[in-house]
Amino acid sequence: MFTLPPLFTTWWGSVTRASDVSLGWVTTCAVLASGLLTYVAGIVRQQLGTRWMYVVATALMLVSLAVVLADPRSLPMAYVWALLSGASSAFTYSPSLTAVQEWFPRRVGLVTGLVNASFALPAAVAAPVVAGMLRNWGFTATVFALVVAVAVTQMVVIFLSTPHWLEKKRAEGLAFARREISAPSVTTAQAVRTAAFWQVWAIWFAGGGAAITMMTFAATYSAHLNDIGVRVSAVAAVTAFVSGNGLIRVVNAMVLDRIGPTVIGCVTSAALVLGYVLLGFVASGWALIVVAFLAGVALGTIFTISPLLLTPIFGIKNFGPIFG
């Protein structure tokens, strides 16, 4: 979700010579599908459970990669890939957050932070690796390798997705803690009529939008800098973004239960604002990399603080649909 859209977009730009606007729709399609289907994923997970959500997500991932293999140089196919890729992310992320809060209801900050980190840190590692594969192997071989990697890793995830050992070992304590954290039990319809819900929504709309724009902006602005004689690699900017996105989730996992989400959210939002201000005055490759890193930090923070802002108020029972 965080690595492939900007890297694939750069490759499609080189082979299709499409405009920045047309290429920008690749990331937009991925984000739209992920955002719109997170709500659906939350509802479906209540009926099917976490394991079947992972099965659906795996199927969507593999189909998305098959689509671009069918016609690698087609921009419409790229849009279809992005929509399917974003959908697979939605069917993985929201169910995972809900599941770990149910399993470890008294360590919500830690476990949701670790789940967030597990989504973002591999992206930081994968960015230079996938970029190297695209450069040395070509697009088709890279996608085939990704198909194999997705199939193998997702089979392991599906197998491990229901921790029966945890249920048996801690059944009594889990039951009490779940009743405690589920006490509010607010429905989605009730949640959207509260000020707290719209405050969190505003954080996502403004802060999340500003941060995730960097997924497209990193490639287009680096191209602009190269055009005016400032040498900078789009891969370096993307790597900075996904690194900030991953590292801050690890930090947040360690400190959220002690510091709380409000302070962390304010600090990272202020840092992102200052970063974008800097970028408006400094035409530098290093400035782009720093701001890309800060955008990743802000996005990772929004992801990790949201459960701590929502669950204590609305409960865990309908967390998936409310978060979506």
Where do the protein language model's features map onto the residues?
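Extracytoplasmic gate region of multi-pass secondary transporters
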Residues: 4-12, 189-254
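C-terminal transmembrane helical hairpin of 12-TM major facilitator-type secondary transporters
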Residues: 204, 212-213, 233-309
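Helix-loop-helix hairpin linking two adjacent transmembrane segments in secondary transporters
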Residues: 118-166
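Extracytoplasmic
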Residues: 1-20, 37-41, 126-127, 214-219
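C-terminal ends and interior cores of transmembrane alpha-helices
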Residues: 59-73, 271-283
